């Protein structure tokens, strides 16, 4: 679920960036999403959105699904025993790892999505 996603992000990025820094970044990080991602980090969010979309197609509710996971040496590890829980956790873990690797450009935070996300 979204609260766990916050924790997974903090696990993967070793506390180097607050999860809120990703909440309104580029065209896809945060609610909704459209257009062309502005950079690598925004592409991570687009892929995460698409992963959640696939979870919904499989009958899951990704924003509400509570799953089991642990943080081992800054690596989120999923540990659920059901299809939906594992799928959603994998979406979140992959996104968090992607966030940790991607450069953060503060100029892409809180952008004007109406003009930049066509």
From Swiss-Prot:
Protein keywords: Calcium, Disulfide bond, Hydrolase, Lipid degradation, Lipid metabolism, Metal-binding, Secreted
Annotated residues for binding of Ca(2+): 28, 30, 32, 49
Record carries keyword Amino-acid biosynthesis: no
Active site (catalytic residues): 48, 92
EC assignment: 3.1.1.4
Pfam families the UniProt entry points to: Phospholip_A2_1
Matching InterPro entries: PLipase_A2 (IPR001211), PLipase_A2_Asp_AS (IPR033112), PLipase_A2_dom (IPR016090), PLipase_A2_dom_sf (IPR036444), PLipase_A2_His_AS (IPR033113)
Cysteines engaged in disulfide bonds, as pairs: 11-71, 27-117, 29-45, 44-98, 51-91, 60-84, 78-89
Protein name: Basic phospholipase A2 PA-9C
